[in-house]
């Protein structure tokens, strides 16, 4: 199934049903009076988080969604039927945004969570509602109110405990294959991974966590090189990042340079994401001699001034991966325990999470704006100058400019 994590749709709630104007007409009953019923309310539109979905592809080709209209009122004080609500199922981790105001309507982060995105219209009133002591036969009704209509953007971020970060061919997919049952494609060329992959790492019988593998970054990704940096949004909700570095790159490049490239691109996307807990994982240690391995590890650590955990592993040979998995599980458990018992720590993490979300949202919006400009033939907003010559389409030739003024 095709992986789609961003779509734009239009939703329309159902209009309310109109009120009915009717009078009681029955044998032997004179001046029966009004008996027009109210209309029914229009159906609303809801988003529902479904844990069985992992892509927004269903909304790529069906972009208009409308809830049912409320029925009109009837005679004998019959109220119209309420329109059926429309439930749109989306993957867990979907953010719903109003496309016109860029306001975040809500995040669907728990299975079964519901979010109303368009309110159904109110019902109209029948003429029975308007009878009074001075108006025994009212001929007044009200129409139903129109339902809300909204243009929405939906962005899906995978929900994972651990995120993998690194250059292409750093061994991210091989690592996730070695520690979980996930089987992402692995090959010896760049950008083998084109979409995020999730794997469940079982540490003990009752202990596990979810790990996310995203496409690799290259230098200049923040400016659109390679696959860009849009996929970094999937790391915004992770609890810890594993920074994978290839100790034995095929092109003979420096592992320290590769590590710096990733950190720079990460900072371009979200400076707050750099403050997330990050562990340095040096992969492919089995491909070089021990002396050279120690020298390269020392070079990377010193170049980055790294103070966090450092692991030297071989994902393909499963060397060091088990210890890393156990340490990750222990860290996640300690983190959850501290969140529950330390309010100051919980507040600090909540503030960091919000900063990451805000910066990621702003970065994605900037990328969308740039894409819109490119579609209109403008490379950037700086190319739009102050053009005061508003009528320069036809009269830019040399010579006097004549402006006709109507008396």
From Swiss-Prot:
Sequence ranges of Acidic residues compositional bias: 385-400
Enzyme Commission number(s) from the entry: 3.6.5.-
Residues that coordinate or bind GTP: 166-173, 191-195, 213-216, 283-286, 314-316
Keywords assigned by UniProt, alphabetized: Cytoplasm, GTP-binding, Hydrolase, Magnesium, Metal-binding, Nucleotide-binding
Composition skew (Polar residues), residue ranges: 129-143
Gene Ontology CC: cytoplasm
Uppermost EC category: hydrolase
Start and end residues of each stretch annotated as Disordered: 127-150, 378-407
GO biological process: ribosome biogenesis
Residues of the Obg domain: 1-159
Cellular compartments annotated: Cytoplasm
Positions with a binding annotation for Mg(2+): 173, 193
Domain OBG-type G span(s) in chain numbering: 160-333
Pfam families linked to this entry: GTP1_OBG, MMR_HSR1
Known cofactor(s): Mg(2+)
Record-stated family: Belongs to the TRAFAC class OBG-HflX-like GTPase superfamily. OBG GTPase family.
HAMAP family found in the cross-reference section: GTPase_Obg (MF_01454)
Record's function text: An essential GTPase which binds GTP, GDP and possibly (p)ppGpp with moderate affinity, with high nucleotide exchange rates and a fairly low GTP hydrolysis rate. Plays a role in control of the cell cycle, stress response, ribosome biogenesis and in those bacteria that undergo differentiation, in morphogenesis control.
Subunit composition and interactions: Monomer.
Annotated protein name in UniProt: GTPase Obg
Organism this protein belongs to: Pseudomonas entomophila (strain L48)
Taxonomy of the source species: Bacteria, Pseudomonadati, Pseudomonadota, Gammaproteobacteria, Pseudomonadales
């Amino acid at each position: 199934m095709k992986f789609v994590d961003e779509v734009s749709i239009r939703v329309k709630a159902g209009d309310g049903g109109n009120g009915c104007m009717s009078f009681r007409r029955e044998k032997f009953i004179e001046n029966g009076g009004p008996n027009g019923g109210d209309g029914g309310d229009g159906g609303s539109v809801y988003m529902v988080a479904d844990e069985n979905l992992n892509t927004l592809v269903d909304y790529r080709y069906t972009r208009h969604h409308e809830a049912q209209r409320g029925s009109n009122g009837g005679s004998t004080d019959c109220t119209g039927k309420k329109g059926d609500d429309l439930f749109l199922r989306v993957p867990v981790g979907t953010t719903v945004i109003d496309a016109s105001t860029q306001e975040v309507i809500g995040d669907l982060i728990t299975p079964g969570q519901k979010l109303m995105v368009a309110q159904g219209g109110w019902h109209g009133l029948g003429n029975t509602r308007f009878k009074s002591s001075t108006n025994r036969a009212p001929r007044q009704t009200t129409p139903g109110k129109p339902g809300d209509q909204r243009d929405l953007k939906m962005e899906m971020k995978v929900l994972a405990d651990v995120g993998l970060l690194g250059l292409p061919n750093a061994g991210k997919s091989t690592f996730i294959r070695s520690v979980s049952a996930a089987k992402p494609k692995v090959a010896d060329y760049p950008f083998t991974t084109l979409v995020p992959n999730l794997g469940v790492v079982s540490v003990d019988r009752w202990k596990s966590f979810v790990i996310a593998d995203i496409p690799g970054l290259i230098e200049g990704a923040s400016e659109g090189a390679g696959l860009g940096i849009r996929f970094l949004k999937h790391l915004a909700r992770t609890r810890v990042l594993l920074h994978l570095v290839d100790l034995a790159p095929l092109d003979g490049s420096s592992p320290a340079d590769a590590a710096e490239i990733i950190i720079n691109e990460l900072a371009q996307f979200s400076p707050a994401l750099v403050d997330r807990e990050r562990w340095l994982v040096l992969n492919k240690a089995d491909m070089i001699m021990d002396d050279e391995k120690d020298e390269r590890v020392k070079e990377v650590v010193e170049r980055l001034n790294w103070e966090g955990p450092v692991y030297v592993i071989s994902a393909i040979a499963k060397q060091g991966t088990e210890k890393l998995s156990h340490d990750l599980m222990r860290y996640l458990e300690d983190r959850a325990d501290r969140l529950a018992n330390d309010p100051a720590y919980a507040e600090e993490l909540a503030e960091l999470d919000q900063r990451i979300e805000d910066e990621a949202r702003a970065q994605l919006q900037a990328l969308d704006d740039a894409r819109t400009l490119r579609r209109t033939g403008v490379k950037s907003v700086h190319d739009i100058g102050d053009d005061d010559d508003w009528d320069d389409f036809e009269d830019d030739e040399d010579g006097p400019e004549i402006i006709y003024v109507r008396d």
